[in-house]
Amino acid sequence: MKQEGSARRRGADKAKPPPGGGEQEPPPPPAPQDVEMKEEAAAGGGSTGETAGKTAAAAAEHSQRELDTVTLEDIKEHVKQLEKAVSGKEPRFVLRALRMLPSTSRRLNHYVLYKAVHGFFTSNNATRDFLLPFLEEPMDTEADLQFRPRTGKAASAPLLPEVEAYLQLLMVIFLMNSKRYKEAQKISDDLMQKISTQNRRALDLVAAKCYYYHARVYEFLDKLDVVRSFLHARLRTATLRHDTDGQATLLNLLLRNYLHYSLYDQAEKLVSKSVFPEQANNNEWARYLYYTGRIKAIQLEYSEARRTMTNALRKAPQHTAVGFKQTVHKLLIVVELLLGEIPDRLQFRQPSLKRSLMPYFLLTQAVRTGNLAKFNQVLDQFGEKFQADGTYTLIIRLRHNVIKTGVRMISLSYSRISLADIAQKLQLDSPEDAEFIVAKAIRDGVIEASINHEKGYVQSKEMIDIYSTREPQLAFHQRISFCLDIHNMSVKAMRFPPKSYNKDLESAEERREREQQDLEFAKEMAEDDDDSFP
């Protein structure tokens, strides 16, 4: 047994590799099945990625087709609203269709418009052939929607002018959003020719929208002066026809046209010679008030400019039109500074206004402290932005306000100060300039002081009690007027029932007479009841 155990150990020692670096047998090669399986797995992974990509693309295409289908159905519904407005002579149905125009215009594409033009322009081949070259013909597949809104007798009937104008307006908006302004101009010119030959009250609301986008296309092409005579002609026609929406839109377009070329005198004449319709919607009112505010500000009527621009902000939409509110706030801040008032800091902290009003916040700080050096620094840094905003001319006028504020701050800080020190603090060229500015501030009532010309210093007078002046009374008057204006505008904005609603209702005197007769009749009945008993 011992011999067998030692033999086994010797056999095991021989089977072990030598410890000293002897050659080892190479490991067996991997099974070919494993290699094939890995290759198949890699190939399977690649095909899975391609399949996932194709699936995602197919899903995106399917969702886009569904969105296009919904858009076409919306356009079909809007056309029904227009037809209902024409047949029932109810303009509110037109308003309902136009109210959805911004939402519809964002979903327009070549496929939707191609299907809409083919589906609606069934009897008018000339207009269809004119519009289709501006669109790319889509690749038809079996899954494409067969859009046929007009079938049978309706397909051969002529399209209503309101519907035709609406569909062409969609084309203009799509081309304008695609920055194809030349092509949009051709369609818009053709649309204006068709509208000019029509005299239909149901078309007035659609035409007002067409006027706006027509002028917008020419503005993008920098040809606003070309379209001015056309807008004047349409304004005369709209006024004669008592078209309030057309009047409001065309007046605002003409004012925008004049202000674009800085023709403030012509704009002022247009405002004075025309009457803005009271029945116009709030958006047109907000635009009109902003344009008149710009005119008043240029003509040094700052109080009136502030009033109109405050009303413009009040008329503007609360949660949208952020760009419009930013533009109005920029001009309003400059006007308030020119009036010698400091805007509320909360204006600059609103999230939608904070970034755009940052240069004006720095400008306000410079004016508030009377720091002429900081004012010049802000002007140099943001001069191009102020010019783009159209406020640079007004901001240049603020230099005198900055100097006046600096003089007032110096007067409050020192009871007596030399003219040379004032010139140094205000960064003026000489003490003579400081003497002139201080004398003008005394004459305007900015400070209460006297100048000693011989010794060259300014002596401030004792401060008077502000409550003994008319300033508190004027401040209260301004606030009360503001509250009364809000009340009056709120009452005007309310909707009241028509006067015909009260025709069948009795007056107060008739009601009193009826109640008196009822009382007498009740007494007679009571006496009859008493007489019936023995």
Swiss-Prot record:
The record's note on quaternary structure and interaction partners says: Component of the 19S proteasome regulatory particle complex. The 26S proteasome consists of a 20S core particle (CP) and two 19S regulatory subunits (RP). The regulatory particle is made of a lid composed of 9 subunits including PSMD3, a base containing 6 ATPases and few additional components. Interacts with UBQLN1 (via ubiquitin-like domain). Interacts with ERCC6.
User: Which part of the chain is the PCI domain?
Assistant: 286-465
What protein name is recorded for this chain? 26S proteasome non-ATPase regulatory subunit 3
Biological process, per Gene Ontology: regulation of protein catabolic process; ubiquitin-dependent protein catabolic process
Gene3D superfamilies named among the record's database cross-references: Tetratricopeptide repeat domain (1.25.40.10)
**What spans are recorded as compositionally biased (Pro residues)?**
17-32
Plastid as UniProt keyword: no
Q: Where is this region: Disordered?
A: 1-68, 500-534
Q: What does this protein do?
A: Component of the 26S proteasome, a multiprotein complex involved in the ATP-dependent degradation of ubiquitinated proteins. This complex plays a key role in the maintenance of protein homeostasis by removing misfolded or damaged proteins, which could impair cellular functions, and by removing proteins whose functions are no longer required. Therefore, the proteasome participates in numerous cellular processes, including cell cycle progression, apoptosis, or DNA damage repair.
Q: Which residues carry this modification: Phosphoserine?
A: S418, S430
Q: Which InterPro entries match?
A: 26S_Psome_reg_C, CSN3, PCI_dom, TPR-like_helical_dom_sf, WH_DNA-bd_sf
List where Low complexity composition bias occurs. 49-61
Q: Which family does it belong to?
A: Belongs to the proteasome subunit S3 family.
UniProt superkingdom:
Eukaryota
List where Basic and acidic residues composition bias occurs. 1-16, 501-525
* Transmembrane regions listed in the UniProt entry: none
Q: Cross-link Glycyl lysine isopeptide (Lys-Gly) (interchain with G-Cter in SUMO1) - where?
A: K38
Cellular-component GO terms for this entry: cytosol; nucleoplasm; proteasome accessory complex; proteasome regulatory particle, lid subcomplex
MF terms (GO), sorted A to Z: enzyme regulator activity
Q: What SMART domains would the database entry show?
A: PAM, PINT
UniProt entry keywords in alphabetical sequence: Isopeptide bond, Phosphoprotein, Proteasome, Ubl conjugation
Please tell me which positions the record assigns to the cross-link Glycyl lysine isopeptide (Lys-Gly) (interchain with G-Cter in SUMO2): K38
